[in-house]
Regions:
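Short, exposed beta-strand/loop patches in secreted or surface proteins that constitute
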Residues: 28-33, 74-78, 163-165
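A generic structural signal for beta-strand entry/edge sites
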Residues: 37-41, 81-85, 168-172
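Charged- and aromatic-enriched interaction segments used to assemble
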Residues: 89-179
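Short, surface-exposed beta-strand/loop "edge" segments at domain boundaries and coil↔beta transitions
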Residues: 12-17, 48-52, 68-71, 93-97, ...
Length: 179
């Protein structure tokens, strides 16, 4: 079975159109652990066209996942005589470096209201939630990922609960994300 995925150079953020190079990997897989790690892996052969040369750290790959077409950032690559393997993570994880909560205080808010406040510092990110629980949390000098998924008592998951689903630059934290 032929797999075709799109690769975007690190500086290309136009994900609405075709990427800079279509890849034809031997395999591409996504592994997600509920409220845990999300990883993708690709294995690409050394091909005559030189597609494998485009696989570089910080490039973005668009591939099909269990929850639709998703964007993943290449975090690590390794080359062998047979090909290139790469480890990727959801682009939402970019928020570790570019969505900082200097002093954010969702006070007596439900899940959706809290996520709206938490994602306000960087409009690239958004959140969805059906959680009706009313709670309060204070986030000072935290990145968005720490604030939502961190192990501290004040994290979104510890205050409001829920299950996490990453969907490109949107995070869904619902009572349940599965069936």
């Amino acid at each position: 079975m032929l797999i075709r995925i799109e690769l975007y150079k690190p500086e290309n953020t136009d994900y609405e159109h075709n990427g800079d190079m279509p890849l034809l990997p031997e395999s591409a897989s996504v592994k997600a652990i509920l409220n845990g790690s999300w990883k993708a892996e690709i294995q690409h052969p050394i091909d005559e066209e030189g597609r494998w040369k485009w696989i570089e750290e910080d490039a973005v790959v668009k591939l099909e996942s269990f929850n639709g077409t998703q964007l993943f950032r290449i975090k690590k690559k390794a080359k062998s005589d047979a090909g290139v393997s790469a480890e990727l993570e959801p682009v939402f994880m970019d928020a570790i470096d570019d969505c900082f909560l200097l002093d954010i205080r969702p006070t007596e808010k439900n899940g959706q209201q809290a996520l709206d406040i938490m994602t306000a510092p960087n409009k690239k990110y958004s959140g969805k939630s059906n959680i009706k629980i009313i709670s309060t949390a204070y986030y000072q000098t935290k990145n968005l990922i720490e604030a939502i998924c961190g192990e501290e008592e004040n994290s979104f998951l510890n205050r409001w609960g829920g299950e996490v689903l990453f969907d490109n630059y949107t995070i869904t934290v619902n009572d349940r994300v599965g069936i």
